[in-house]
A protein has these predicted regions:
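Short loop/edge segments at beta-strand edges and connector loops
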Residues: 106-108
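Short, charged low-complexity linear segments at domain edges
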Residues: 142-158
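Short beta-strand segments
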Residues: 12, 65-69, 130-137, 141-143
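A short acidic/small-residue loop/turn micro-motif
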Residues: 36-38, 87, 156-158
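A charged helix-plus-loop insertion that forms the helical arch/lid used to bind
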Residues: 78-88
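ATP-binding/phosphotransfer module of carbohydrate and carboxylate kinases, centering on a glycine-rich
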Residues: 1-63, 73-78, 93-104, 119-126, ...
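Short hydrophobic alpha-helix segments
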Residues: 33-35, 83, 152
Length: 317
């Protein structure tokens, strides 16, 4: 559809915000809007998706694509389960199609982000890609020989819920000790709150006003950037867990490239430096095989929305 003037809206629906962008078929962002996600109210979230889409829609828009965290049925666009949100069986695609009258598709947010990076970002030109979005939790997507690997039921890529410690923290999926509890924003926040309790003189404790419940992942990251050794230690530990898991996945999948998106990328080398070091150690016989680059998503926070928009336009052809 290149050169046709066709445009699409891409939505990235997360636990805290719902972002919409309008893009050309070449991936050029023309407009954007973001609204808070009413995460505990499914109907309010569906209505927010309509509202944020209307704010960027024009007559040139031919389709809408949605990327949402959780298990999404690709054929129906229904979100069946979201471990970090109070949603079950949400008719994402159908609600927007009915409300706006435009063909709408929905997919897992990591699949959408991976597709964006594959088509227009850090993985352009690669055929075998492992994408991991490490934000509040961890989502994953696998591109094999240029195609998204979806599995028998369309739910492939839920790497954040690999159990690494059965006695570990309770996860939103209902299990204990999932990888995302050690290598994502969950881990940073949990460790930051514990540090605020155990180290009352730390920058983390001062920045939260002495109330550990006020500690967030960004607060820990900001403290680390300001030189706080406790915060830096937290990011390093989470980074090592991230890299170890990525190395294990690379052993299974043998990708050309590993792309990391989400809040982990925003933390920069304070987290990704330790991640890269443990990633190399975790790869089997790393000295005897081609190196696997571990890079950050070049589309940044737009990766999921751009990828969803590209998916929607491709569905029209």
């Amino acid at each position: 559809m290149s050169g046709t003037g066709a445009q699409a809206i891409g939505l990235d629906v997360g636990g805290t915000k719902t972002a919409a962008i309008r893009v050309t078929v070449e991936g050029v962002v023309l407009a954007r809007e973001t609204l808070p996600t009413p995460a505990n109210d499914m109907q309010a979230t569906l209505d927010t998706m309509v509202q944020v889409s209307r704010s960027v829609i024009t007559p040139e828009v031919r389709a809408i694509g949605i990327g949402a965290a959780g298990l999404v049925e690709k054929d129906t666009g229904r979100l069946t389960f979201a471990p970090n949100l109070a949603w079950r069986n949400a008719p994402l695609a159908q609600h927007l199609w009915d409300s706006l009258g435009l063909p709408t598709i929905a997919d897992n947010d990591a699949n959408a982000a991976a597709w964006g990076e594959f088509k227009l970002g850090a993985a352009t030109g690669c055929r075998h890609v492992l994408f991991v979005g490490a934000g509040t939790g961890i989502g994953g997507a696998i591109i094999a020989d240029g195609r998204l690997m979806r599995g028998a039921h369309g739910f492939a890529g839920e790497v954040g819920h690999i159990i690494v410690d059965p006695d570990g923290p309770l996860c939103g999926c209902g299990n204990h000790g999932c990888w995302e509890q050690f290598a994502s924003g969950h881990a940073i926040t949990r460790a930051g709150r514990e540090a605020a309790r155990q180290h009352p003189q730390s920058m983390i404790a001062r920045r939260c006003g002495g109330d550990p419940a006020q500690v967030t992942g960004p607060l820990v990251t900001e403290s680390a950037r300001a030189g706080d050794p406790v915060a830096r230690g937290i990011l390093a530990a989470v980074g090592r867990s991230l890299g170890e898991g990525l190395g294990g996945l690379a052993n299974v999948l043998d990708p050309e490239i590993v792309v990391v998106g989400g809040g982990a990328a925003a933390a920069g080398n304070l987290l990704l430096g330790p991640a890269r070091a443990s990633f190399v150690v975790a790869i089997e016989a790393a000295a005897h095989r081609p190196p696997v680059p571990l890079v950050t998503a070049s589309l940044g926070n737009d990766a999921g929305a751009i990828g969803a928009a590209m998916m929607a336009l491709e569905k029209l052809t």
